[in-house]
Every structure is written in structure tokens, then in C-alpha cells.
Amino acid sequence: MRTFAVHESTIAKRYATALAELASELNILDSIRDELAHFQALLAESPEMHEMMVSPTVSKESQHKLISTYLEYAKPNDLTANFLRLLIDKHRMALLNDVATAIVRVVDERAGRIQVKVETPKALTPSLVAKLEKSLADVTGKEVSLEISEKPELLGGLVIRMGSVMLDDSLRTQLHRLKEIMKG
């Protein structure tokens, strides 16, 4: 199963790279990101529509009719519309989330930004959030956009995720390591 997931991720990155290059040439990369995010949100809100768009048992014709209705409503630029049609034609609509995530990374990278996910056992004060943002900006040399979530099971400390890097300095992990050391 892992091989399939890695394969899909690689394909999604290829689609995202090609789309990002075209969007950059047309100077509409931010627009593409926003339009894909909008469609992605729509699919997340409607499990029935999501299932219809990704199911191999639903005909391309039915999927194209559905996407045409969406395109008439949302009126995205031609590149987004054609890209969504291409995903249908190639039976790759299931990759939309990965492609959209990769597009966000490309846009952020070009703008000198990085998305950082932080898990904490309890809410951080605004001053701690500001210090954390500054520290991460100093380390990465980029503007940091934090997504903070509370995870009481961490007990203390932080878990920080930046792209493929994870720093786990949670009390839960420290206690687990101590337990392993004591086992021998």
C-alpha cells in the first residue's frame, strides 16, 4: 500500500510542477492556488460530489458534466478549468488534494514563505506565538505561517512540522525515550 501512496505522490508532484510552471509563465500562480483550494473545499464539503469525481465506476462523461456545472458557477481561469478536465480525462482527480498542497508549497517557496504546523498541549499565548514565529523565521530564513493545534496528549513541549522535517520535543516523546532507555 505504501508503494502506491508514494507513486501517487510522485505523480501529483509532476502534475503540480507542470501546472505551476504554466501558471508562473502566465503570472496567475496565486489565482491557480486559490481556485484549486476552492474546488478542494467544495469536494470536502460534499462527500457525494467527491465520490462521484474520484470513483472509477463513474463515467468520464458524468464527471465532465459535473465539472462543467462547477466551472459555470465558479468561473475560474482557463488554465484551472483545463487542468480539472485533464485530471478527469486521466483518471487522476483523486490526486487533487496532493496537487493543491504541492501548488501551495510552490507559491510559498517563490514568495519566501513556509507553512509550519505546530502541535502544543495547550494554547500558546500571543507572545509565545510571536517568539516561535521569529525563531522559525530566523532558522529558515523565510516568512513563517503557523498552523497551531492543541494536542493535550503531548503533556508538554512542542511538535513542529516543516515540509518533510519533524521536530518532536514533546514531553510524551521524552518520557517514551526514557522508558526505552530504562528497559535496557
From Swiss-Prot:
Which cysteines in this chain are paired by disulphide bridges?
A: none
Keyword field: ATP synthesis, Cell inner membrane, Cell membrane, CF(1), Hydrogen ion transport, Ion transport, Membrane, Transport
> Organism's domain of life?
Bacteria
The record's GO CC annotations read: plasma membrane; proton-transporting ATP synthase complex
Q: Which GO terms describe its molecular function?
A: proton-transporting ATP synthase activity, rotational mechanism
InterPro entries, A to Z = ATP_synth_OSCP/delta_N_sf, ATPase_OSCP/dsu
Pfam families noted in UniProt? OSCP (PF00213)
Its record classes its membrane topology as:
Peripheral membrane protein
Cell compartments where the protein resides: Cell inner membrane
Q: HAMAP family per the record?
A: ATP_synth_delta_bact (MF_01416)
- Name the family: Belongs to the ATPase delta chain family.
Subunit (UniProt) = F-type ATPases have 2 components, F(1) - the catalytic core - and F(0) - the membrane proton channel. F(1) has five subunits: alpha(3), beta(3), gamma(1), delta(1), epsilon(1). F(0) has three main subunits: a(1), b(2) and c(10-14). The alpha and beta chains form an alternating ring which encloses part of the gamma chain. F(1) is attached to F(0) by a central stalk formed by the gamma and epsilon chains, while a peripheral stalk is formed by the delta and b chains.
Functional summary from the UniProt entry: F(1)F(0) ATP synthase produces ATP from ADP in the presence of a proton or sodium gradient. F-type ATPases consist of two structural domains, F(1) containing the extramembraneous catalytic core and F(0) containing the membrane proton channel, linked together by a central stalk and a peripheral stalk. During catalysis, ATP synthesis in the catalytic domain of F(1) is coupled via a rotary mechanism of the central stalk subunits to proton translocation.
Its name, as the record gives it, is ATP synthase subunit delta
Q: Which organism is it from?
A: Magnetococcus marinus (strain ATCC BAA-1437 / JCM 17883 / MC-1)
